[in-house]
Amino acid sequence: EALIKQHINGCQKGKILDVGCGTGFISLIFAKIGCEVIAIDNNIAMLKAAAKISEELGFLNKITFMLKDAESMDFTDNTFDTVVSRHAFWLFNNPKKVYGEWYRILKSGGCMLNLDANWLFPFWGEEQAKHFRSDEDILTKRYGTFRDYYHDKDMMNEFKKLPLSYIKRPEWDLKICKETGFKEIEIETLAQEKYWNSFMALRYRTMPTFLVKAKK
């Protein structure tokens, strides 16, 4: 949370849209600093979990949760001061369109923040897979046998069909953001050891989280 706050400097005011909010991690960060947050997701179970967590922490009155498809939002133009997304963009079927939607609904001078990673990097080739397996062996020795979605072959096969699965990012994001009209585009790679706990930092070492930050 502290690391994210460092990177959202200048974007932490006004009306915020959290796209693909999941359990509300990013929504809560903005709510805690006094922003009005609208959080959307297309998964009702995630929204319920996020609302429950927000209520327990006393911030439910600061966040409005909505069931919406990020690729066809019905918000009017120039509505939000900041649009933010964390670990959701790679799942979109039409990511270029999503950047266009974000640009449309942002106010002039508004901020766009996109936290993501090359989540399917281990499947890009044998060399990438080798490094990923090596890290997995280290984790197993340290923490014991574990399972996550990388062990779910059916899920991985579905993810491989997504348009961004084999696209090198954030280079792609930089190109599309420029074409969309965004200005002051910045790309940063986050310090994994500060962003994740020790287990996750090693698990995702081969696919570090990056931040795309830009203004309309």
Sequence positions of predicted segments:
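Conserved alpha-helix/loop element of class I SAM-dependent methyltransferases that forms part
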Residues: E1-K13
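Class I SAM-dependent methyltransferase SAM/SAH-binding core
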Residues: L17-V19, T23-S72
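A short acidic, Gly/Pro-enriched loop at the edge of an enzyme's catalytic core
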Residues: E71-T82
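A short SAM/SAH-binding and catalytic strip from SAM-dependent methyltransferases
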Residues: T82-P95
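A short glycine-rich, Lys/Arg-flanked "PGG" loop and its adjoining helix->strand segment in the class I
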Residues: K96-S108
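Conserved class I S-adenosyl-L-methionine
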Residues: C111-D148
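Short alpha-helix
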Residues: L164-G181
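Core SAM-dependent methyltransferase catalytic element
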Residues: T180-K183, S198-K216
